[in-house]
A protein has these predicted regions:
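Active-site acidic/histidine clusters and adjacent loop/turn architecture
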Residues: 1-33
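Charged, low-complexity, helix-prone segments enriched in Lys/Glu/Asp/Gln
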Residues: 12-15, 43-50, 85
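Catalytic cores and adjacent binding grooves of peptidoglycan-active enzymes
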Residues: 13, 56-126
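A broadly tuned "polar low-complexity/structure-edge" signature
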Residues: 17-20, 33-37, 89, 115-118
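Short glycine-/small-residue-rich flexible loop motifs, especially phosphate/cofactor-binding loops
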Residues: 23-24, 46, 89, 93
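Extended, low-complexity, intrinsically disordered C-terminal regulatory tails
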Residues: 25-52, 98, 104-106
Length: 126
């Protein structure tokens, strides 16, 4: 079983409490260790990410604390292997379902698939 590290906990500061609960439960369920790469994001940081092509919107859910990016943590570093993100997503979805929280995974998007990205569903968290 894995647990969130100090840095991950710090990066969850400012994130909506329901999403924090999902992440905290998912780390218990996940067969893959993960780290929180980013939670709450400033509008300036978002502009930088859009300019670099790392994001496609200035209206990111990160700006309101309604999104997190998680990185698969393997051999003390982030591993970007896509299959790992499916496993993390399964844990996040199971945790969300268990807690009655509706989330959206960036890996399920039709365009600009974003494996590390999880956000609270706008239908329930406008």
């Amino acid at each position: 079983m894995f647990k969130l590290g100090k840095r991950s906990i710090e990066r969850l500061q400012g994130v909506h409490p329901d999403l924090v609960k999902v992440v905290e439960r998912a780390i218990d369920l996940s067969p893959v260790d993960f780290t929180v790469l980013e939670g709450l994001r400033s509008p300036e940081r978002q502009q930088t990410l859009v300019a670099s092509g790392a994001s496609q919107t200035l209206n990111s859910r990160h700006i309101t604390g309604h999104a997190v990016d998680l990185g698969a943590w393997v051999d003390n570093q982030v591993d970007w292997s896509w299959p790992l993100y499916h496993k993390i997503a399964n844990a996040m979805k199971a945790a969300a379902n268990e807690l009655g929280v509706s989330i959206v995974w960036g890996g399920d998007w039709r365009t600009f698939k974003d494996g590390p990205h999880f956000e609270l569903d706008r239908k329930f968290y406008p």
